[in-house]
Amino acid sequence: MGQAVEYTDLGATVHRDGLLDGAAAELDGLYESLMSTADWFATRESVMPDGACLLDRPRHVLPFTIDGDTVEVLNRTFAIAPADAERACEALFRAVPQARRIHFDAMFPPGRLRLPTRRLETTDHMVVDLPAGTEAYRASLGKSTRQNLRLYENRLRRGYPDVHTEVMIPGDRGRELVDRFVSWKVDRFKELGRTTYWELEPDMAERFTELLRRCGEAHVTSAGGAEAAISFVFHVGGSAFALETAFAPAFEHCRLGFLAQYWVVCDAAERGAACVHLTWGTPTYKGRLGATPRPATMLSVFRHQGSRLWSLDEAACAAKARHPRAAERYEAARRAARRTAASAKRRAVSLMARR
């Protein structure tokens, strides 16, 4: 629409003409988050922003799309104070009259947002906060983790004395490396009876290759004269994002996937990164590498309480998504109650026998 509206009381300006180049250039420095970069929006998410909400004091750049009555703020895994999120939502509701809800990814407790909301999904982003240097990072790990890492590395080097890792800008090899990575990932998931999102989204490999070409690097481990593991890493400001890792099935006994991620973190520490994002999922082994969870909750933010009635289908989907976890908790509680009852019965029988 080629228009911008300024709301001085909110310290906000809403542009309805896409993401301007100047605003896009600010994203990396503002958030140091791969998931809040123009490259991520264009490739991994495959969306073009319809506009951007710009805040002052403090500065924020929040690209968004509009789909009917829904505004989607595209930023992910980024820091914003609840009060600033409120300012942005108020400005967007004013600028987009037909909007009844705004989808917003919050890394603060959702209850601190003083607007009507619905919680859709919560994920834990696993992040390693790095001390200064590789040795300090290694020393920060638990004793058993350090012992296991030495065990796995020694096992790998005994079997493959030539093992080494090269950090490269993929260039023309990008698609080749992505295809090899995907083949390893698919083979491993098949053994587990699972399907990868690479199979569910056939164009994912092409989009990921473009993201890699724009801003990524490949950590390629070779052993026995062949490539054995690949990690794709993206540096944004002082943050490193270890987005994907896969390895050849023959190296399972060496725990090469675990080692590859450990080496990525060590490399980031050596290069002076402040933190490494190991993204979401598999929190147990990522925790062994020093990662701690940072919850992110996808919210529907409403203009007013009555707007909820226009999205009851969304409420049903959110409830359904939560249902399996509720069922699991119920079953766990039921089993615990059964064990308690059985234990009480055994004690009662024992007491009766003594009388």
Task: Go through each PLM region and give its residues.
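The substrate-binding groove and active-site-proximal loops of carbohydrate-active enzymes
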Residues: 75-82
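Non-catalytic accessory segments adjacent to catalytic cores
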Residues: 84-132
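A conserved beta-strand-loop-helix scaffold within acyl/acetyltransferase catalytic domains
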Residues: 2-69, 107-125, 135, 139-252
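Aromatic (often tryptophan-rich) hydrophobic motifs at membrane interfaces
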Residues: 89-90, 94, 198-312
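Active-site/acyl-donor-binding loops of N-acyltransferases
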Residues: 3-13, 112-136, 140, 271-340, ...
